[in-house]
């Protein structure tokens, strides 16, 4: 758990708001108890080693310490939430220390000596109780019948998008930490470092290891910048460094930052393309307001990308035809963005209401997973990109639209891989708060980039 002391004055109201939501759920679903299981360690196959522990995100919403296996949050109507902690002696492993943690004051705390001992804190009759967690076998052994019921999950997932002040503060701190990593990785790149060495610089600057961050670091140089999730960093430095795309974050009390930046080794046309994407990012953020449907933003992104593809001479037809024929999806094959919070791709992104009514993506954009209408106090990423992805380009070269592409021009940019710019945005009623542009990263970009 990475946090500063100024978070904790915000925590009581956060718990109060979560409890208020839960009270509505208890009445609606006729529940007397919801037991949220943090999870438990999992062994490697045929081994005595464990995978890194990842807590149930529903547990993380209540508990800021994310490294608590076999812990529980028990919710009851009109009752202070109970935090159950496993307190058995363990000389094999280091366990998280909660001594003196100020946020514990918001809970009634119980200690159990073994994972099985949770049974004594649960009612015998569980017909009006629900289990939320990954371990179905644990729930069944404890006698739960309502295991991850859809009405409960849909309710919590829908409301997860509306952030409390505490949650926004966590996301803000995570952005500042991640920004330090991005600056360190960029410095290493400009000094000729490999992808792997840039990764090491990133981790050193953020003080967060690979098992602490919300998702695997993506650091791709040259052609590797065209791989959307390049998770195998090259340990050998390239003899001809051209570009680097970094998509990496940080975590504070379970809340994620998710930032992408792209760098050019030289001041050239590729850097101009980066600058064009940066302007598109800011323009789209300016259009993201309460009442706007996210698919409309996604469509606008493709219109802007089409303009850039035409302006840079990659495609010769009109922007309208590019979109109609699906050419822009070759260069931008992913969604414009997603909700951000306890999960990098946070849940509830395609729900119309708390009952879970789905909102389908628009025709031709099936990869768009965020289809909700934007509302105040929601947090989204905005991450347009232009990529030169060999399999997609090959498919385009074999299509009826191949004559519309300036293949010589495309070949000039393929060695750079691609470009992605990604910011984290809090939406308010009258304004947007760009958490990423308030960090040290913004000043660094302006210092090292000619076109910033």
Swiss-Prot record:
Q: How is the cofactor bound?
A: Binds 2 manganese ions per subunit.
Known cofactor(s):
Mn(2+)
Query: Which positions bind Mn(2+) 2?
Result: 247, 258, 422
GO terms (molecular function) for this protein are: aminopeptidase activity; metal ion binding; metalloexopeptidase activity; phosphoric triester hydrolase activity; proline dipeptidase activity
Q: Which Pfam families match?
A: PepQ_N, Peptidase_M24
Q: Where does Mn(2+) 1 bind?
A: 258, 338, 383, 422
- One GO cellular component term: cytosol
- This entry's Enzyme Commission designation comes to 3.4.13.9
GO BP term (any one): proteolysis
The family database entries (InterPro entries) matched by this protein are listed as: Creatin/AminoP/Spt16_N (IPR029149), Creatinase/aminopeptidase-like (IPR036005), PepQ_N (IPR048819), Pept_M24 (IPR000994), Peptidase_M24B_aminopep-P_CS (IPR001131), X-Pro_dipept-like (IPR052433), X_Pro_dipept (IPR022846)
Highest taxon in the source lineage: Bacteria
Instruction: Write down the chemical reaction(s) this protein catalyses.
Output: Xaa-L-Pro dipeptide + H2O = an L-alpha-amino acid + L-proline
Instruction: Reply yes or no: does the keyword Manganese apply.
Output: yes
* Keywords linked to the UniProt accession: Dipeptidase, Hydrolase, Manganese, Metal-binding, Metalloprotease, Protease
HAMAP family xref list:
X_Pro_dipeptid (MF_01279)
- Described function: Splits dipeptides with a prolyl residue in the C-terminal position.
Note the PANTHER family from the entry.
XAA-PRO AMINOPEPTIDASE 3, XAA-PRO DIPEPTIDASE
Q: Would you identify the family this protein belongs to, as annotated? A: Belongs to the peptidase M24B family. Bacterial-type prolidase subfamily.
Q: What is this protein called?
A: Xaa-Pro dipeptidase 1
